[in-house]
């Protein structure tokens, strides 16, 4: 692998290490975590711009993704709100917007006619596929600086770091 020259994070970590009152910062860990954070922010900005070109927000995308990747379990508005950690009022606004755009619909729950479930429409599914392919291309471009073997190694190492939080697949909770 071709080594890159030092970057801004290296310089920040070096200055941090020189500060006498900073005792608990491990420079290597700081560099790793800072880089993960910067990569996440940059990728999120690219994704949000792409989703905007498709006429949806990040939150809209999360709802469609949960509907399409959530398996066969019907999803209620309150279930979606809980999964995405937003209020039911905020979820109502998102669902109203998606329904107005023709991307989702609320239908009576056949198991309990007092409640509704949310479904993606054919247009919602088509938009999701177009967007997921665009986002996937962006992600592939980001890691294309690595060989396939390096990508597998990085993926394995990041999985190990993520497992180190010790909370299983509960990775999207803000209680960490």
Question: Which stretches of residues belong to each language-model region?
Answer:
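N-terminal leader segment of winged-helix/HTH proteins
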Residues: 1-54
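C-terminal regulatory/oligomerization modules of transcriptional regulators
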Residues: 1-24, 149-152, 156-176
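Alpha-helix C-capping/helix-to-loop hinge sites
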Residues: 19, 50, 70, 138-145
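N-terminal helix-turn-helix DNA-binding core of bacterial DNA-binding proteins
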Residues: 27, 37, 41-87, 169-176
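Amphipathic alpha-helical interaction segments
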Residues: 31-38, 62, 153-156, 160
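Alpha-helical linker/hinge and terminal dimerization helices associated
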Residues: 43, 84, 127-146, 161-172
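Charged, amphipathic alpha-helical coiled-coil/dimerization segments
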Residues: 96-156
């Amino acid at each position: 692998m071709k080594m890159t020259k030092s970057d801004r994070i290296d310089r920040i970590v070096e200055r941090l290490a020189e500060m006498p009152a900073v005792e608990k910062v491990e420079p290597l860990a700081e560099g790793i975590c800072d880089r993960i954070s910067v990569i996440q922010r940059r990728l999120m900005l690219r994704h949000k711009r792409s989703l905007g070109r498709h006429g949806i927000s990040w939150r809209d995308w999360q709802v469609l993704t949960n509907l399409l990747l959530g398996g066969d379990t019907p999803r209620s508005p309150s279930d979606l709100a809980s999964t995405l950690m937003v209020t039911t009022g905020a979820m109502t606004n998102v669902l109203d917007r998606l329904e107005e755009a023709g991307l989702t619909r609320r239908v009576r729950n056949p198991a309990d006619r007092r409640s509704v479930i949310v479904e993606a429409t054919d247009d919602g599914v088509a938009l999701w596929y177009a967007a997921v392919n665009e986002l996937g291309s962006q992600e592939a471009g980001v890691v294309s600086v690595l060989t396939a073997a390096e990508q597998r190694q990085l993926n394995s190492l990041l999985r190990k770091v993520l497992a180190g939080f010790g909370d299983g697949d509960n990775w999207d909770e803000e209680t960490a």
